[in-house]
A protein has these predicted regions:
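Short alpha-helical elements of helix-turn-helix
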Residues: 34, 72, 242
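Catalytic strand-loop segment that frames the active site of acyl-thioester-processing enzymes
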Residues: 1-46, 50, 155-220
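HotDog/MaoC-like acyl-thioester-processing domains
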Residues: 2-16, 73-83, 87-167, 244, ...
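Structured core of small recognition/catalytic domains
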Residues: 180-284
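An N-terminal domain-cap segment
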Residues: 55-78
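A short, amphipathic edge element
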Residues: 67-70, 85, 235-239
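A short, polar/charged loop/turn motif at coil->beta-strand junctions and beta-hairpin connectors
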Residues: 9-14, 61-66, 174-178, 231-236
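Hydrophobic pocket/interface hotspot
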Residues: 29, 88, 132, 192-194, ...
Length: 321
């Protein structure tokens, strides 16, 4: 039985059930970060449909529920074929916004024990699509919501810095490195033409491997393209908070810029910015806690004192999100 079920909290909803499909897993051999977020996105939609907003995610709807901030905490790997389930609940209901939490769990083992794979916390807004402004929740939803207690759930290692979305020039002035670029595709958008958070996570995921200053040990070892002992370590994401600043749409160009905020022996904090290279505006900013994983032992590797000293030389004192 799930720990949440055993607490007798009826506000939790079984909002998604499936598995980690092989093609969703990356070169590290586990579910890629974007697909944790994608499954949580489905769970959030299922939750609000269940709460009475049946048309909120259909094309042509007058209003929707949109994620403004999202924090993911990875706790246990989901390897190919892993059976997973998500339960979701509302932890706070404001006038026009709400806080929602999703708990992704592995299927019970032979002894009935359930292990949490990840948690996703979202701050969402009720949006009128004609004006793109937040407006009050309907009474039917207010009557349907049962607030859940999510104490002890969520990220713990992220720095408490504000994310205000500096523009491209400001990001460059901070000393961040350009690690990714491309153009958003139609397949990355929701029913209303906005690029989904799962794609923003994914674009960051496929770019951060170029961030040599954040992961010098994996570059020195040859990364995953190396051979033998050199290919046994790789950077891994542990927690990340994303804040959306301006809507991104298909056909819009983007760049990913990254910087090192702080470094410790076992983990390091990074800041990523996804910006429009044409207007300079910020689409989103992300603060992450990452580490280096031994791919054979499947656990984090601590930096030696000398390696940590070298890594800390790459910290950007004025870096913000």
């Amino acid at each position: 039985m799930s720990p949440l079920e055993s607490g007798g909290q009826s506000g939790w909803l079984a909002s998604w059930k499936g598995e980690a499909v092989n093609w969703e897993c990356d070169e590290l051999g586990h579910l890629n970060m974007r697909h944790y977020v994608g499954k949580a996105e489905e769970a959030r939609q299922f939750l609000f449909i269940h709460l009475g907003l049946a048309h909120a995610y259909r094309a042509g709807a007058p209003s929707t529920v949109r994620t403004r901030e999202l924090t993911v905490c990875y706790l246990r790997e989901a390897r190919p074929g892993a059976r997973l389930a998500i339960r979701s609940g509302v932890t706070r209901l404001g006038e026009v916004d709400a806080d929602v939490v999703h708990v992704m769990e592995h299927a019970p083992d032979a002894h009935g024990n359930v292990r949490v794979a990840a948690t996703v916390e979202e701050r969402v807004e009720h949006i009128a699509l004609r004006t793109q402004a937040a407006f009050a929740w309907p009474q039917r939803l207010r009557k349907a919501v049962r607030i859940v207690d999510a104490g002890g759930i969520g990220a713990r290692g992220l720095p408490g810095i504000d994310a205000f979305g500096p523009d491209r020039d400001a990001v460059i002035a901070m000393g961040a490195d350009r690690v990714g670029a491309g153009v958003f595709r139609a397949s990355e958008a929701d029913a209303f033409g906005h690029i989904r958070p799962t794609s923003l996570f994914g674009r960051c995921s496929e770019s951060v491997g170029h961030f040599r200053k954040g992961f010098p040990e994996t570059h020195a070892a040859g990364g995953l393209s190396g051979h033998g002992a050199a290919a046994r370590v790789s950077g891994v994401l542990l927690e990340m908070r994303l804040v959306r600043h301006a809507p991104a749409a298909p056909g819009r160009a983007f760049e990913v810029w990254s910087g090192l905020l702080e470094a410790r022996a076992a983990t390091r904090n990074l800041v990523h910015h996804i910006v429009d290279p044409v207007s300079g505006a910020s689409f989103a900013s992300m603060v992450a806690t990452s580490g280096v994983m031994d791919l054979e032992r499947r656990r984090l590797v601590k930096s030696t004192p000398d390696a940590l000293e070298r890594l800390r030389r790459n910290v950007l004192p004025g870096l913000t999100a």
